[in-house]
């Protein structure tokens, strides 16, 4: 086992002898192949964006909950209790434990929400621009 082993590299020259590359329109076929690959990649990554460009999403219709919330207002009483005013009546705002919410500077709180002095919609802070 004391023999020396010499490895000589063997190189195989790659030859592409496909019919579509040897025809006179070989560049056309390569171009078609590249366009198909590009369209597949675009479809994979940007399918939703392309669809939304041509077919935009329909705006959701207003439901009864949103129309009720649009007509809901917060008001302050003289004793500092926070009241909810709806078309069906005026109700006391309740804490999680069921007790009425009383804030010493109730009108200051409402004016800090969106600049209203006596009443404001509790959902108007989400509609600011």
UniProtKB/Swiss-Prot annotation:
Its main location: virion. GO terms for biological process: fusion of virus membrane with host plasma membrane; symbiont entry into host cell. Keywords: Disulfide bond, Fusion of virus membrane with host cell membrane, Fusion of virus membrane with host membrane, Late protein, Membrane, Signal-anchor, Transmembrane, Transmembrane helix, Viral envelope protein, Viral penetration into host cytoplasm, Virion, Virus entry into host cell. It is found in: Virion membrane. Induction: Expressed in the late phase of the viral replicative cycle. It comes from the Viruses. The chain crosses the membrane at residues 27-47. The keyword Glycosyltransferase does not apply. The keyword Transmembrane helix applies. GO terms for cellular component: membrane; viral envelope; virion membrane. Disulfide bonds join 76-106. Most cysteines are linked by disulfide bonds. They are created by the viral disulfide bond formation pathway, a poxvirus-specific redox pathway that operates on the cytoplasmic side of the MV membranes. It holds the Pfam family Pox_L5. It is a single-pass type III membrane protein. Envelope protein part of the entry-fusion complex responsible for the virus membrane fusion with host cell membrane during virus entry. Also plays a role in cell-cell fusion (syncytium formation). Belongs to the chordopoxvirinae L5 family. Part of a stable entry-fusion complex (EFC) which is at least composed of proteins A16, A21, A28, G3, G9, H2, J5, and L5. Formation of the viral membrane is necessary for the assembly of the complex. Interacts with G3. This is L5 homolog.
């Amino acid at each position: 086992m004391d023999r020396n082993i010499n490895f000589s590299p063997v190189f195989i020259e790659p030859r592409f002898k496909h019919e579509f590359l040897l025809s006179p329109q070989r560049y056309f076929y390569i171009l078609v192949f590249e366009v198909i690959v590009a369209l597949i990649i675009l479809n994979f990554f940007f399918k939703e964006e392309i669809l939304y460009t041509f077919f935009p999403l329909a705006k959701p219709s207003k439901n009864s909950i949103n129309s009720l919330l649009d007509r809901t207002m917060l008001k302050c009483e003289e004793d500092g209790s926070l009241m909810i005013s709806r078309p069906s009546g005026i109700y006391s705002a309740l804490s999680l434990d069921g007790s009425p919410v009383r804030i010493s500077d109730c009108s200051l709180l409402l004016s800090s929400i969106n600049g209203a002095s006596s009443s404001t919609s509790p959902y108007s802070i989400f509609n600011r621009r």
